[in-house]
UniProtKB/Swiss-Prot annotation:
Cofactor(s) needed by this chain: Mg(2+); Mn(2+)
Annotated Gene Ontology cellular component terms: cytosol
Catalytic activities: (2R,3S)-3-isopropylmalate + NAD(+) = 4-methyl-2-oxopentanoate + CO2 + NADH
Gene3D superfamilies named among the record's database cross-references: Isopropylmalate Dehydrogenase
Pfam families reported for this sequence: Iso_dh
Subcellular localization: Cytoplasm
Keywords: Amino-acid biosynthesis, Branched-chain amino acid biosynthesis, Cytoplasm, Leucine biosynthesis, Magnesium, Manganese, Metal-binding, NAD, Oxidoreductase
Major localization class: cytoplasm
Record keyword Cell division present: no
Official protein name in the record: 3-isopropylmalate dehydrogenase
Site entry: Important for catalysis: Y145, K195
Subunit structure: Homodimer.
Length: 366
């Protein structure tokens, strides 16, 4: 009996619906050409949900996600909802509750410098020409963003604010296992990021990561202090395979990795739990300034579908096909405005059409 692949589709706000339309083109190719039993159902989330239902994450949307095997997420937020109380705004009202409800403890951000796009990188050509293929594995539900106590104190003599970095053993163990398991599917290198020369939580982090590493004899483990890591990523990003990071350090370094690729419109991401249920989304935001102009880059969303095939559905060959189609499209010189070095570029829908056609032709030849 063929397996069903149920996907909850949440286009959201801004450019979300536009790039999601291009994602549907890829899913239709997978259904028609590979006979995958992919079923999609669309739900409101973010600002559009606030306008319709008064909340960013309606019960119907949450139930739809529960009934699915994975979530394909567009983008949320925009100026229209910025004046709402912070807990009601699209990001805090939808994305954070989804992460919490499904226990999405790991965030995977993929950063690549694609062949032919080296000049887009802010790095010197002698560095960018060496390439970059970094998978940043960030712990997502612990650390200083969630530790207690936190707050502020006001007095006549001295005002202060404070946060607490707390990591439990099980939190470090599960994200370490995730990083090492992923490294086995790549180049078998893990670089763990900490500040173990100063922070107790980082000393604890390093101790546990070292212990977990003994279960993965094929994977080479190294450690870097976060300040040195930030420098090394700029000096020679090609040396890295998998970065294993705490919540705070991963938040910072994943954005640094994104910057060196030249465009955030190329960067997919995944947030996973221990059952391989995942939320897949482009790394960029809702870009309300270009909403409706048909100029957004859909590649990050399309590559997010590839990550879904790889990590939630374990369809590795399908994921490779999607990656190949995107690579081929870029090698042929097709560009959206954000990655074009001149005035020659194609729009959102054309980019989706071309990638879908190249994917279909590739499948036909197999």
């Amino acid at each position: 009996m063929k397996r069903n692949y149920k996907i909850a589709v949440l286009p959201g706000d801004g450019i979300g619906p536009e790039i999601m339309r291009e994602g549907y083109k890829i899913l239709r190719i997978l259904k028609s050409k590979l006979s995958l039993n992919i079923m999609t159902q669309e739900f409101d989330v973010g600002g559009v949900a606030i306008d319709k239902y008064g909340v960013a994450l309606p019960k119907k949307t949450l139930q739809g996600c529960r009934d699915s095997h994975a979530i394909l997420f567009g983008s949320i937020g925009g100026p229209k909802w910025e004046d709402l109380p912070s807990h009601l705004q699209p990001e805090r009202g939808a994305l954070l509750p989804l992460r919490k409800y499904f226990n999405l403890f790991s965030n995977l951000r993929l950063a690549r410098i694609y062949s032919g796009l080296e000049k887009l990188s802010p790095l010197k050509s002698r560095i960018s020409n060496l390439g970059c293929d970094i998978l940043c594995v960030r712990e997502l539900t612990g650390g200083i963003y969630f530790g207690d106590p936190k707050g502020s104190k006001v007095s006549k003599s001295l005002n202060c604010a404070f946060d607490t970095e707390v990591y439990y053993q099980f939190e470090i163990e599960r994200i370490a296992h995730m990083a090492f398991d992923l490294a086995l599917t790549r180049r078998c290198k893990v670089t763990s990021i900490d500040k173990a020369n100063v922070l107790e939580s980082s000393m604890f982090w390093r101790k546990i990561v070292n212990r977990i590493s003994t279960q993965y004899s094929q994977v080479k483990l190294s450690h870097l202090y976060v300040d040195n890591a930030a420098m090394q990523i700029i000096k020679n990003p090609s040396q890295f395979d998998v970065l294993l990071c705490s919540n705070l350090f991963g938040d910072i370094l994943s954005d640094e990795c994104a910057a060196i690729t030249g465009s955030i419109g190329l960067l997919p991401s995944a947030s996973l739990n221990d059952k391989n249920f995942g939320l897949y989304e482009p790394a960029g935001g809702s870009a309300p300034d270009i909403k409706g102009k048909n100029i957004a880059n859909p590649i990050a969303l399309i590559l997010s579908i590839g990550m879904m095939m790889r990590y939630s559905f374990k369809l590795y060959d399908v994921a490779d096909l999607i990656d190949w189609a995107v690579n081929k499209t870029l090698k042929l010189g097709y560009r959206t405005q954000d990655i074009s070095e001149n005035n020659k570029f194609i729009n959102t829908s054309s980019m989706g059409d071309i990638i879908a056609e190249i994917l279909a032709n590739r499948i036909h030849k197999i």
